[in-house]
Amino acid sequence: MDRGSLLPFQLWCPRPFGTYSQNQPRPPSAALKPSACPEPGGGAEPDHGPAHSENTPPALATEVPASQPAPLLSAAAAGDEGRVLLDTWYVIKPGNTKEKVAFFVAHQCGGGSRASSMKVKGHWGSDSSKAKRRRRCLDPTKAPPDPGGREGPPAAEEGPASAGEDVDLLSVAEMVALVEQRAALALQSYPRPTTPAPVVFVSAEQGGPAKGVGSERRSGGGDCSRVAEAVAHFEAQRDSPPTKGLRKEERPGPGPGEVRIAFRISNGREPRAPDSGLPSGGGGRPGCAYPGSPGPGARAKDKITCDLYQLISPSRDALPSNVEFLLARADEASEGDSPAPARPEDTPPAPPPPPARDCGASGFHVDVVVTGVVDECIFFGKDGTKNVKEETVCLTVSPEEPPPPGQLFFLQNRGPDGPPEPPPADSPATAPGPDDAEGTADTSLCRLYRHVSHDFLEIRFKIQRLLEPRQYMLLLPEHVLVKIFSFLPTRALAALKCTCHHFKGIIEAFGVRATDSRWSRDPLYRDDPCKQCRKRYEKGDVSLCRWHPKPYHHDLPYGRSYWMCCRRADRETPGCRLGLHDNNWVLPCNGPGGGRAGREEGR
């Protein structure tokens, strides 16, 4: 089939079951585009003449000539280019003759301003899916799309009057680009606080604060980004530190109740503030404990910093009243002239920025999220100094707010006058002086720990004393312990044997028997090694032991006895499984095998 002999008119089909809608001719200003797909039948079927049937549209008085004639098409098809494109679409039945002629119809949704992205789906799923996957035919008059994938069709650029015109069938990439560009144009003309999900706007500067939705964006076709660019922007926002311009709900911070601590080990090229201990190049981060000038025998390039740059309380709404950053100085030299820390009631508690990433080639940055209790974190450096600072994080709650679970004893009691004062620094927090004989003058100690209440310490001490075994029981003589153990049941003795090795040795050495024990105290049973029963025996069952080779009967002074396991009622008890019950040696008169035993003895 020659492609040059195909007709360029628009395809049309009626609605199912022969229902027509009103025919809407295209205005003369619209550009008539070539057909989306050629007819496999060679265009012989549309040339039926004036005969109107159910599948033929009624003739119209006005015909629109083609504004863009195809150069490769035949000249005889110029009179058929003025066909009217109906706003109807037809579900192709399998086996219909129109399936060979029409595959798709550009459907206009009643003069709306957006292009229809509806899939042409049929009610009969046998052959209609084949037509939906047809590729677009070759059109030499249409320019190929640019590498960016953004193509401005004439219907979207002519103005609001022609913005809702029919759009020819496009490929998947072209349709995605068209939808993205139309959404971007609509968002530029009508700024709204909510941005649709498929459109992602990337701010022009990555280092500065992120822009809002209604703020100035990049002009031109670069407004809507591709999928890869959006994914890269999302990953960059997730990996990058939080900026000051973000709101609190947009800030990528930890969850409620988490403490995020950033540690940075960098080289010594950054200058240090002499008195406050805060770096001058990092934007004044509070809570950074910088050691002092390096000693003669220490490395001058390494210093360890500890930044507590975000602390989110369990209640984010009452953040100023729930979170306090209290800094306690431990050194005696700077105790008098150090200024008091600002309370969150006076200034809004904006979290300090994270440490900068320009740490040099030898530095690295680690983010540690701590959700549990931080008792004490000790970091040893190589710089000898006395300026060691404690950073204490105190969580306080209002009296009407219930305490968070798991932190009942970690919350300080809030008095009626105001928040509690920071506890005084203890002696272990002081740095070792230069006059130490151990030579630890060049080791600086930076501690970050959380103070706990005195009630918690008392309760923890009482619980530990209750849980630990009594130490004075080890001082008792053995005969007293044996007498005490003889009054205990089976489960208590088993628990003592599993708890303390000393008690286990006494119980096994002296043969302590439980009060509910079924071991035979007869000395004749002392030679029986079988102490465990694992097999399920019936009452009166006589069989060999599973672990010890011994006869199933025993000749005793009072007659031949047979070994059997525990009774069925006692077999499920833990004592039987632990081997603390006795093995029953029953006489022939007690078991069903007594007659057989008597016959064996008579032989």
UniProtKB/Swiss-Prot annotation:
UniProt GO cellular component terms: SCF ubiquitin ligase complex
Modification Phosphothreonine, positions: 347
Disordered as annotated region, ranges: 20-63, 111-163, 235-301, 326-360, 396-440
PROSITE patterns named among the record's database cross-references: FBOX (PS50181)
InterPro entries (alphabetical): F-box-like_dom_sf, F-box_dom, FBXO34/46
Keywords: Phosphoprotein, Ubl conjugation, Ubl conjugation pathway
Domain F-box, chain residue ranges per copy: 470-522
Post-translational modification: Phosphorylated by ATM in response to DNA damage, promoting ubiquitination and degradation by the SCF(FBXO31) complex.
Keyword Phosphoprotein recorded: yes
TM region(s), chain numbering: none
Modified-residue entries (Phosphoserine), positions: 21, 67, 338
Compositional bias annotation for Pro residues: 347-356, 417-426
GO biological process, any: SCF-dependent proteasomal ubiquitin-dependent protein catabolic process
Result of changing residue 216 to A: Does not affect interaction with FBXO31
Listed pathway(s): Protein modification; protein ubiquitination
Compositional bias segments (type: Low complexity): 152-163
Molecular-function annotations in GO: ubiquitin-like ligase-substrate adaptor activity
Function: Substrate-recognition component of the SCF(FBXO46) protein ligase complex, which mediates the ubiquitination and degradation of target proteins. In absence of stress, the SCF(FBXO46) complex catalyzes ubiquitination and degradation of MTOR-phosphorylated FBXO31.
Self-association state and partner proteins as the record states: Part of a SCF (SKP1-cullin-F-box) protein ligase complex SCF(FBXO46) composed of CUL1, SKP1, RBX1 and FBXO46.
Descriptive protein name: F-box only protein 46
Organism: Homo sapiens
Organism phylogeny: Eukaryota, Metazoa, Chordata, Craniata, Vertebrata
